[in-house]
């Protein structure tokens, strides 16, 4: 008798678990689809929409349909990209075969990227503060800071790239660095566009 009761209870719990799993799966799929659609629509406002979609779609479940989380995620992705670029340029600077001008350009670029990382990190903080701002004035104070820091980070990326311009620079060094910086600049530009779009939603 006890075994029969236990078996019946087991079947009941198992069927409940299956029903719960089967009902939550479509909901998760719908949520993810809505989030992806939101990301795709939002990225149309950026200068590099394909880069925007490809870099942010993987975070759809955390972004959902929040303009603030979208901007914040774009900044986080760009910070990671900037840190990776900084390491790449630093390793490049350790090559003894570099010319004197190339060595100086690498050093200057590392400083620019370091500043970009700091400014993007501060921008992330400001965007977060926008989410808890009390009143219009407080929101725009943090928003203005976020826009300023991100714009400055974009300038840092462009300044680094300019240091490798001209025919004097070695083709391999110039091309490898500028390709990385180009991608960083695009990510930063997109993040700034999404911050501006978030501001318009307020």
From Swiss-Prot:
GO CC, one annotated term: apoplast
One Gene Ontology term of the molecular function aspect: pectinesterase inhibitor activity
Protein name in the entry: Pectinesterase inhibitor 11
Alphabetized InterPro entries for the sequence: Invertase/methylesterase_inhib, Pectinesterase_inhib_dom, PME_Inhibitor
Annotated S-S bridges: 43-52, 109-160
Localization terms from the record: Secreted, Extracellular space, Apoplast
Gene disruption: observed consequences: No visible phenotype under normal growth conditions, but mutant plants have enhanced susceptibility to infection by the necrotrophic pathogen Botrytis cinerea.
Coiled coil: none
Gene name for this UniProt entry: PMEI11
Annotated PANTHER family: PECTINESTERASE INHIBITOR 11, PECTINESTERASE INHIBITOR-LIKE
Membrane-spanning ranges: none
Gene Ontology terms describing biological process: plant-type cell wall organization or biogenesis
Signal peptide: 1-21
Residues the record marks as carrying a glycan: 76
Free-text function comment from the UniProt entry: Pectin methylesterase (PME) inhibitor involved in the maintenance of cell wall integrity in response to necrotrophic pathogens. Modulates PME activity and pectin methylesterification during infection by Botrytis cinerea and contributes to resistance against the pathogen.
Record keywords, A-Z: Apoplast, Disulfide bond, Glycoprotein, Secreted, Signal
Induction section of the entry: Induced in leaves during infection by Botrytis cinerea.
Tagged with keyword Glycoprotein: yes
Similarity annotation: Belongs to the PMEI family.
Pfam families per the UniProt record, alphabetical: PMEI (PF04043)
């Amino acid at each position: 008798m006890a075994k029969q009761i236990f078996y019946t209870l087991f079947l009941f719990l198992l069927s409940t678990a299956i029903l719960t799993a089967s009902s939550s799966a479509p909901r998760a799929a719908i949520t993810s689809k809505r989030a992806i659609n939101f990301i795709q629509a939002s990225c149309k406002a950026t200068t590099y929409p394909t880069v925007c979609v490809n870099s942010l779609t993987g975070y759809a479940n955390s972004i959902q349909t929040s303009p603030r989380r979208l901007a914040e995620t774009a900044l986080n992705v760009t910070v990671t990209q900037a840190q990776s670029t900084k390491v790449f340029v630093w390793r490049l600077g350790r090559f003894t075969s570099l010319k004197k001008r190339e060595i100086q350009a690498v050093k200057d670029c590392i400083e620019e990227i370091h500043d970009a990382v700091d400014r993007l990190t501060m921008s992330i903080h400001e965007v977060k503060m926008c989410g808890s701002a009390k009143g219009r004035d407080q929101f725009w104070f943090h928003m203005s800071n976020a826009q300023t820091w991100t714009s400055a980070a974009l300038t840092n990326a462009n300044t680094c790239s300019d240091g490798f311009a001209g025919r004097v620079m070695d083709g391999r060094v110039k091309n490898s660095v500028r390709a990385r910086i180009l991608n960083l600049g695009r990510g930063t530009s997109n993040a700034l566009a999404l911050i501006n779009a978030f501001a318009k939603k307020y």
